[in-house]
Amino acid sequence: VTTGLRERKKLATRRALHEAALRLVAERGLDAVSVDDIADRANVSPRTFFNYFSGKDDAVLGLDPDTSPRQVAAFLARPRDETPVQALRAVARAQAAEMATDTELWPLRLKVIDSHPALLARLAAVFGEGERVLAAAVAERTGTRAGADAYPTLLAGVAGVAMRTALHRWFAGDFTAALPDLLDEAWDLLSAGLPAPPR
């Protein structure tokens, strides 16, 4: 089996497990769904489930451990003549565009998260860890120190807030707006120094 085929099979299995978990929780609620239920719906063994996710919450959220490394690599690969803000904004916009192509699962994911505070807490923890990893990449690109200097942590945090704001607005607007455009609006406001809205 070629590496490419093996990777595609792994991605397909991960997606099948995520989709099964998400749909089951949407139907029954988080507490009424077990790992066995998810594995059964996805036609895999519970043992296989744990090769992909540490538990049902992570399966429902579809957490992919490669997301942060991919973002960091994309950020560090951006042209050096871009400012760190421009580079991070471009990476975030590409991510939003990719998310928006999943017109079925992303809206369902956000609806399920909205109904289950435990999932929201888990997602917040994942976002926090992602921002720490991103701050280290910003520090590497700018010659600053993550944790000691404000810039890398602040820029990574601002990127996270911009994405969360866009996702909240996408959800509140029943997914009718374009997610990348909502993200652009957030970055535009931040870049302008958050001027007060006209009365």
Question: Positions of the model-derived regions?
Answer:
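Amphipathic alpha-helical segments enriched in hydrophobic/aromatic and basic residues
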Residues: V25, S34-V35, K56-T67, V85-L88, ...
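Hydrophobic/aromatic residues within well-ordered alpha-helical segments
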Residues: T13, T67, A92, V126-G130, ...
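Basic, helix-initiating cap at the start of DNA-binding domains
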Residues: V1-R28, A32-R41
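HTH DNA-binding helix-turn interface
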Residues: G4, R28-L30, N43, F50-L61
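Amphipathic alpha-helical packing segments from all-alpha helical-bundle domains
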Residues: P117-T142, A150-G157, T165
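Hydrophobic/aromatic-rich alpha-helical bundle segments in the mid-to-C-terminal region
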Residues: R141-W187
